[in-house]
């Protein structure tokens, strides 16, 4: 019965996607300048080139992936074009960083999460505002939004000047287990993508948000290579499962433990 239910879900999703034209993140379009006020870019002082994204969840805290940790991180907020600076762009450095596991010992299918406390709070502005944490986990089949300055080519590193956005769907975790043999039977990750491929997060999008109904439900973690292959969805750290840890850290409990 479980197998029949999974196959039925896959068929429904495939039929619904077949009527949608592929958009040319991978398979995305330039984000509207006003839809990503919570999106931040992470880069290092020396390189001055971003390597990851993150999500502003209040004036003092940014959510990203553990894999995005670096020394001398700089955080740029309010940015759209990397070539044209908005008047309200703000740059911050971390005051503290928190992990479920060490940034060196997380696994790619579990606990890929980093919480950054900014040295100075940011001010809300035309292009800067936090996004809400989830009130409930996302439903299977939910249409969600991914965004970032990651490569827009599956075969070569082609980074856009502006963030790209794409709509993808929450898929049954069994779809990702079928795609990636080493995935455990259960994990605190979301499986999301497009079954026929063509839309996906890719290199440079790590740490960025998966937005469902105006709430950050996932953190870009990892996926197939090349990006955007059929039946190779992406894996996203499930924010809802880490909600108690996030709220405890923000409240000042530095000894808070992550879910097992």
UniProtKB/Swiss-Prot annotation:
Peptidase S1 domain mapped to chain residues: 25-251
GO molecular function: serine-type endopeptidase activity; toxin activity
Signal peptide: 1-18
Cystine connections: 31-165, 52-68, 100-258, 144-212, 176-191, 202-227
InterPro entries per UniProt: Peptidase_S1_PA (IPR009003), Peptidase_S1_PA_chymotrypsin (IPR043504), Peptidase_S1A (IPR001314), Trypsin_dom (IPR001254), TRYPSIN_SER (IPR033116)
Main location (coarse class): secreted
Keywords of the record: Disulfide bond, Glycoprotein, Hemostasis impairing toxin, Secreted, Serine protease homolog, Signal, Toxin
Entry annotated with the keyword Signal: yes
Tagged with keyword Disulfide bond: yes
GO cellular component: extracellular region; secretory granule
GO BP terms, alphabetized: proteolysis
Subcellular location: Secreted
Tissue: Expressed by the venom gland.
Alphabetical list of PROSITE patterns matching this protein: TRYPSIN_DOM (PS50240), TRYPSIN_SER (PS00135)
Glycosylation positions in this chain: 83, 123-124
Domain of life: Eukaryota
Propeptide residue intervals: 19-24
Annotated family: Belongs to the peptidase S1 family. Snake venom subfamily.
PANTHER family: KALLIKREIN-1, KALLIKREIN-RELATED
Function, in words: Snake venom serine protease homolog that may act in the hemostasis system of the prey.
The protein's name in its UniProt record: Snake venom serine protease homolog 1
Organism in which the protein naturally occurs: Trimeresurus stejnegeri
């Amino acid at each position: 019965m479980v197998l029949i239910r999974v196959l039925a879900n896959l068929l429904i999703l495939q039929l619904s996607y077949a009527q949608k034209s592929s958009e040319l993140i991978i398979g995305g379009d330039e984000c509207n300048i006003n839809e990503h006020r919570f999106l931040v870019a992470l880069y290092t002082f020396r390189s001055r080139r971003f390597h990851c994204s993150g999500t502003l969840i209040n004036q003092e805290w940014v959510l990203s992936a553990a894999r995005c940790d670096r020394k001398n991180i700089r955080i740029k907020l309010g940015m759209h074009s990397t070539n044209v600076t908005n008047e309200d762009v703000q740059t911050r450095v971390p005051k503290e960083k928190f992990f479920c596991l060490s940034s060196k010992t997380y696994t790619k299918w579990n606990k890929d999460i980093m919480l950054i406390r900014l040295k100075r709070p940011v001010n809300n502005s035309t292009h800067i505002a936090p996004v809400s944490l989830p009130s409930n986990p996302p439903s299977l089949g939910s249409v969600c939004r991914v965004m970032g300055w990651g490569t827009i080519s599956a075969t070569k590193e082609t980074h856009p000047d502006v963030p790209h956005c794409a709509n993808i769907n929450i898929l049954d975790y069994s779809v990702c287990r079928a795609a990636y043999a080493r995935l455990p039977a259960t994990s605190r990750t979301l499986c999301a993508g497009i079954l026929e491929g063509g839309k996906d997060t890719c290199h440079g999008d790590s740490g960025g948000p998966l937005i469902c109904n105006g709430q950050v439900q996932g953190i870009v973690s990892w996926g197939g290579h090349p990006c955007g292959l059929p039946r190779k969805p992406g894996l996203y750290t499930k924010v809802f499962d880490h909600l108690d840890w996030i709220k405890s850290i923000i409240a000042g409990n530095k000894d808070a433990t992550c879910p097992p």
